[in-house]
């Protein structure tokens, strides 16, 4: 055999063990750095959530104490709401005198139901909501109030919420706040309409 054929026939020499050891060390180091990067990113996300929660003032213990959702009225409460017969003469007389009409809503849309958007007919039975005096067809407002407890026009809650501490109803709170001096008011009597929310 010739010298050149001897070199071609032999396999390449195995790499030295130092090169293999350096490659495995590099893989271990890179995987450790990747794990550390994932851990730092997770901690940063948790810290950011905690910081935002503290800035917005959300207390995890108070989350369970949120007010109940706006559910509908019970049949007994629904039947207790006043009904009236619509008369066009009463609504036009009240509009001419600029007086609040007891048989219809707030003057600008007093001749139509805000739910079905049809005008009231003479002699038609309407239901008047007690807190805001908005008027609606009985069938329309009854269907609305079985799933929600607020006025469709002004979104005012119709169910009075009673304070556990003093027994006052939130529906009468606005009139009491205006009449009482500030040092006699109970904190449950304040509403968001009276006191603006604090914005940082």
Curated annotation (Swiss-Prot):
It catalyses: S-ubiquitinyl-[E2 ubiquitin-conjugating enzyme]-L-cysteine + [acceptor protein]-L-lysine = [E2 ubiquitin-conjugating enzyme]-L-cysteine + N(6)-ubiquitinyl-[acceptor protein]-L-lysine. One of its GO terms (biological process) is defense response. Pathway: Protein modification; protein ubiquitination. It is a single-pass membrane protein. It holds the Pfam family zf-RING_2. The chain crosses the membrane at residues 26-46. Induction: Up-regulated by chitin. Its EC number is 2.3.2.27. InterPro entries: RING-type_E3_ligase_ATL, Znf_RING, Znf_RING/FYVE/PHD. One of its GO terms (cellular component) is membrane. It comes from the Eukaryota. Belongs to the RING-type zinc finger family. ATL subfamily. The RING-type zinc finger domain mediates binding to an E2 ubiquitin-conjugating enzyme. Interacts with BIK1. This is Probable E3 ubiquitin-protein ligase ATL45. It comes from Arabidopsis thaliana (Mouse-ear cress). The gene is ATL45.
């Amino acid at each position: 055999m010739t010298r050149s054929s001897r070199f071609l026939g032999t396999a390449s020499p195995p790499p030295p063990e130092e090169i293999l050891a350096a490659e495995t060390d590099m893989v271990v180091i890179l995987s450790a750095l990747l794990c550390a990067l994932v851990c730092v990113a997770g901690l940063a996300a948790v810290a950011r959530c905690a910081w935002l929660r503290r800035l917005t003032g959300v207390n995890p213990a108070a989350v369970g104490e949120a007010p109940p959702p706006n559910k509908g009225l019970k049949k007994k409460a629904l039947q207790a709401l006043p009904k009236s017969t619509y008369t066009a003469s009463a609504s036009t007389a009240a509009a001419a005198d600029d007086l609040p009409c007891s048989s219809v809503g707030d003057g600008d849309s007093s001749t139509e139901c805000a739910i079905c958007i049809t005008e009231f007919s003479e002699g038609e039975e309407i239901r008047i909501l007690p807190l805001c005096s908005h008027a609606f067809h009985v069938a329309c407002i009854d269907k609305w109030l079985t799933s929600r407890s607020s006025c469709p026009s002004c979104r005012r809650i119709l169910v009075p919420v009673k304070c556990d501490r003093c027994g006052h109803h939130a529906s009468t709170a606005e009139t009491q706040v205006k009449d009482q001096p500030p040092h006699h008011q109970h904190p449950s009597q304040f509403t968001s309409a009276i006191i603006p929310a604090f914005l940082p």
